[in-house]
Amino acid sequence: MSNLPTLATGPVQLPGTINQDTIVFIDAEVSPETGKIVDLGACRPDGRFFHSSNVAAFKEFCKGAEYVCGHNIVAFDMQYLRPVLGDGPQPVDTLPLSALLFPRKRFHKLLKDEKLLTDELNNPLSDARKAMALFEEEVAAFNELPGVLQRLFCAMLKNRPEFAGFFRCLNVQTPTFADPAGVIKRLMADRLCIHADLDGLAKRRPAELAYALAFIRAAEPADVIPPWVNTNYPATQAVLEALRFTPCSKGCPYCKERLDVKTGLSRFFGFDSFRTYNDEPLQEMAARAAVGGESLLAVFPTGGGKSITFQLPALMQGELTRALTVVISPLQSLMKDQVENLVSKGISRAVTINGLLSPIERSRALEAVISGEATLLYIAPESLRSRSILAALQQRRVTRFVIDEAHCFSVWGHDFRVDYLFIADFIKKLEDFYGANSKIAVSCFTATAKQKVIQDICDYFKQRLGLELRILATSAERKNLSYRVIHVENDADRYARLRELLEAAEGPAIVYVATVRETKELAAALTADGLEAVAFAGRMDATEKSANQDAFIAGQVKTIVATNAFGMGVDKKDVRLVVHYNISSSLENYVQESGRAGRDESLQAQCCILFNEEDLNTHFALLRQSKLTLADIQLIWNAIKSVKSRRFSISPLELARKAGLEYDELQLDTKVKNAIAALEIAGYVRRSMNAPRVYATSVAVKSTIEARERIEASPLFATEAERNEAVRIVASLISARSGYKTKGEPAETRTDWLADRLGIALPQVVAVIGKLRQAGVLHDDNDMSATVSRRQLKSASAVLGTYQNLESLLIRRLSDGGRADFNLKELNNEALAGGSASDVKKITTLLMYLKAAGLLDEMRRTRGSQNVSLVTKRSTQELEAAAQMRADLCAFIVESLKAMAQNGASAGSSDYVALSFSAVQLLRDYRQQSWLTETPVTLRDVENALLFLHRTGVLSLEGGFMVSYQGMTLERVELDNKRRYRKQDYAQFSEHYRQKVQQVH
């Protein structure tokens, strides 16, 4: 890492205040098995050094030293070296000092941890020299601090063993501050609340306060408290929150400016005031409660603007303390919409991680969470069982969970979801990991005001996390909506009435239907009749779904035909008509769906139901299909009891087959997991984190013929039966890879499903896949898929040329000191005058990409205007080189995709082509073509180029290819094999289904 100390090998001149003869720099290597010293290293500033396992010789080398200095020696080395060195030398530890004096550095390990000098790994002399170099830098950094801050740190930390040696070594004066709070206020009055309990924190949490002050003084927007500090001083984040995000009742200047929600609303979103409902300031109340650290349950009317009430506090808190807010949402489309809406406002601090993302997008989103770039993370409740999500959140400080559609907790709600019941367990895991009595606040949002649902939500968090939810509710009515029920005789009459409504509509319309098939059929019929419409459903092709949604929101298409997966969080205020082609499954769903009309309260909108008595039968049939019966759960319980281990990993398919259940593939996963949830609620089992395994990420052959040749040439497959079995497995994988998205469903590469479909035992499938890797048929080359338009590929050069010209224009603006302030419209006019096919959206797309790629350090857009401020620490030469490399890579990738589109089997009459390719192979091909290029190109550069092509619309990245096993981790709690799952255990689910029937009625 560039910001780590350089290696010092010769004589070193320490600051004049330090006697060079009094300090030795040391490091010890200790066997973790025996706890005995196996190697020692030491050096002195005059150039003398020691490297041996001889303890007596080491003691002699250190003789006469008043101080021994090393990295992490107080917590580690000294417990082994104190018996050797005696009580004489005082330790000086560079690790806690590094975190205090270089708070912007994320990591504080020595260079060996970066694996850059492999020949020096575990070399204690090398580490001692690095500690000496780091100590020099720390002394220099300390001397650059204002004198009053030096003395303040000394006063707070001089009695702590990890810091005492440093201050004594530097002979820092140790004043006794009668009023440390006053000193801090004078230093940082504009950066923290002057009414915070500074005196109390200085007494109770001196180290944490020191780290917090250092961070506040030095940090920039993307910085986070170093993980080492959070691990070893876990209360630091709480101290930071107390200083910077706890509004005082007295209203100090800092709190008035930085913690006032109305000021924040204007600064982040450009609004002067919050919305009210029947003169109730519900939005403002919810935002203030969150800023005040309260847990809450807010009942908002559909279209009531709830998003801003949790986005605003999250953005304010993230800016001031780098805390992360996690938003749990059941719909992937909602997450995408909300993140894109924030991006369109110039807010780049929100990301989502969901199944619609390509592997590159997912990887970048995780990076943004870990690095501190993101302050808002949107995920689905099922993602909480992902170990990678847990690991990412453990590296940040989550201070609030926002639960959207909170009625999903309750069996009395219209959309009970078992995945919601794991939320409290996950929050508890994080709290336990953070330690220091860390409490994570919760904000729940729902549109249902059913008292039983509200009680269930409050009871859940009270019983599971000890949280009291403040209830905020309004009885506001949507006065700009009118409702009609239109009776229809048959399907022909239904369609005719729909056409009449659409022809008379004064603006955009949403038509809700019951099934995915109906969305496509009805949209096609309307378009054929001259009423252009697009389809939208949760299980549609991701590219088509996204394109259709974008076209409707942008006003390019007037009508969208959708299932109820569409609409939540969609920022379209001018919808004038919502038609339920079929009745909704519940009154709550109907209120929510119809409420997507007329979000602009100045517009009148219609909500119509086309109703026939037979419609009810359709809903009852769907309910019967999805119902989980008592007998189903009993069979799943019997299957679990048949497993010998108390704790084990098993996939939903394996468990269903073991139970003798033949579910439809689309329902199997949900039904099995619901059955496990029922058993967990009743205390029979405990389900914890998922246990996935990935066996390969690419197929290294282009055809089954090539695969057979490699298999037959390999000695790993001894018999003809083994070879045939291997060919069958590879053929399925190749078919799955090449068929990705062509059938509107994901590639089937799960090992348990492969075993089931091919009639081969799962252990045998896994064994064959291992041999296929050894034979070079399967690799880890990151196969991925993309949908491209032949038309778009032809015009790609022009599109990329436009972006290249825009980037050149931006770089010229940034050349003066790495900062630029400009107006988007004016910049666009300048680009147009220069002959570029520019528009403001393209400029915004480019800016957001450059920010995400790390080429821009800061980007601020004045809310409600087109004014933008940019800051970069890159030189003009670096920016130009990065732009040129990306342009070359993009051009190469486009030509490669053109060749694939022309040569591939998918080259039919359709404009859209589904392609599979490997990012690693693209890198190899590019390096082979560009072997004379001086600048080395990495896999990340290729991924960045693919991401750029995706964001500029040249291609649409889809999911990756993985041969995997998706296991659930289960543990039996009830160990009595005679115990049966009983009717009284099923009561909660029985009530849920009774409620569903009642809701249809």
Predicted regions located by residue number:
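N-terminal cofactor/phosphate-binding cores enriched in small/glycine residues
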Residues: 31, 36, 40-43
